[in-house]
Design a protein with these regions (language model features):
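Conserved short "hinge" loops at termini or chain/domain junctions
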Residues: 1-65, 79-114
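Catalytic-loop motifs flanking and including active-site residues across diverse enzymes
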Residues: 68
Length: 114
């Protein structure tokens, strides 16, 4: 599981993404994390990605965690809206787009730092 390489639990994941629902779990997000991993590893290369994880705690590690978490959440935004609608929680399209943009901005900032 991609997320387990960088995060031990959802609270660790939540440190890097704003506004995450506390009912979310890492396994629910993993399919989006696979896509995020592929995009990030394609940019920085798989060996560099793995070296950052191997080195562990540090500035690059935090940038990688921020990038992966925010891109994962950006990819999950549409499905999060569906889950909320099933729970009878309305969300406006403009809110959804603002949330997605914020996640992408955080992702791009982290990738620039990497």
């Amino acid at each position: 599981m991609i997320l387990k390489d960088l995060f031990t639990d959802i609270s660790g994941f939540a440190e890097f993404v704003p506004g995450i629902d506390s009912n979310t779990n890492l396994s629910l997000l993993n399919s989006h994390a696979v896509t995020a991993y592929k995009r990030i590893a394609n940019i920085v290369s798989v060996p560099v990605y793995n070296n950052i994880i191997k080195k562990g705690a540090g500035e690059l590690y935090d940038h990688l965690r921020t990038a992966l978490a925010n891109l994962t959440m950006a990819n999950d935004t549409v499905f999060d809206v569906l889950r909320k609608r099933k729970a009878n929680i309305d969300i406006y399209k403009s809110e959804q787009e603002a949330i997605r943009r914020a996640y992408y901005e955080n992702y791009y900032n982290a990738m620039d730092s990497l």
